[in-house]
Each structure stands twice: as structure tokens, then as C-alpha cells.
């Protein structure tokens, strides 16, 4: 199972705020969450919660790799995911496609200045109303 392999997840402040910081408990049994934000932890945030707030993706990647040890570092999509992809630090992209068409929304990787190519999917798992895909990032 993929979730068992993740040691640390990197998210942006938007995801952290939308989830209310998962009430201080990282999601899906993940050990640590690194939050990229120019703002500090929310007032009253438990300093013992396994969340680390950093200013940029370089600090986030370094901290996440140290915290994860030999486990996977996962990066959420959105602006932070796009920044890490643009920095050439993403090995693979996993996405789940569901049959819902939105009229508008946010870009999967925020705003990217350059084109980034993905290989054909090397994993395709069809579930009930969901398609799980994994793509290697071309270098």
C-alpha cells in the first residue's frame, strides 16, 4: 500500500488552512507534515504536533527528507507542487481522476513558466468511479 510508504507530506498554507491542519494529526497515518508558508503556525497551535512550518521549498524538501528517513516524501499538488516540479525535484506524479467536471478551479500545479513532460502512465488502476494514475517525470 502506497500510504504506508509515506513518511512526510509537504503542503502549502492553503491546503493546511482548508483542512484546519487536520486537527494536529497528519492524514492517512503519515508521520509528519511540512507546511510551506510565509506565515507562522496559527495562534494556539500545539507546538508538539508533528507539523513543521518553513518559508520555502528548499527548506521544506530538506526537512521532509530528514523527517521521512528512508520513506517517501510526498508533495501535494497546487502552487507548492508546481514549485517543486519546476525545481526538478519530483520523480513521479500520482493523480486520481474522477468523473466530475468542474466549471472552474485551480491549476493542478499552480502557474508554471515552462513545460514539463511526463512519461506514459506506468500504473493505471481502475476503481469504482476513480482512475488512479502514476507518471514518471521526464528529465
Where are these predicted regions, by residue range?
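Portal/gating segments that form or line small-molecule/metal binding sites
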Residues: 1-89, 99-139
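Extracellular, beta-strand-rich glycan-interacting domains
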Residues: 96
Amino acid at each position: 500500500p502506497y500510504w504506508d510508504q509515506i513518511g512526510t507530506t509537504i503542503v502549502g498554507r492553503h491546503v493546511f488552512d482548508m483542512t484546519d491542519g487536520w486537527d494536529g494529526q497528519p492524514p492517512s497515518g503519515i508521520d509528519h507534515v511540512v507546511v510551506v508558508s510565509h506565515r507562522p503556525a496559527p495562534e494556539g497551535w500545539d507546538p508538539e504536533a508533528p507539523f513543521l512550518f518553513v518559508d520555502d521549498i528548499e527548506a521544506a524538501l530538506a526537512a521532509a527528507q530528514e523527517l521521512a528517513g528512508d520513506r517517501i516524501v510526498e508533495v501535494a499538488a497546487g502552487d507548492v507542487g508546481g514549485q517543486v516540479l519546476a525545481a526538478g525535484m519530483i520523480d513521479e506524479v500520482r493523480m486520481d481522476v474522477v468523473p466530475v467536471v468542474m466549471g472552474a478551479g485551480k491549476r493542478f500545479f499552480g502557474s508554471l513558466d515552462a513545460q514539463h513532460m511526463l512519461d506514459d502512465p506506468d500504473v493505471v488502476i481502475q476503481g469504482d468511479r476513480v482512475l488512479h494514475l502514476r507518471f514518471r517525470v521526464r528529465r
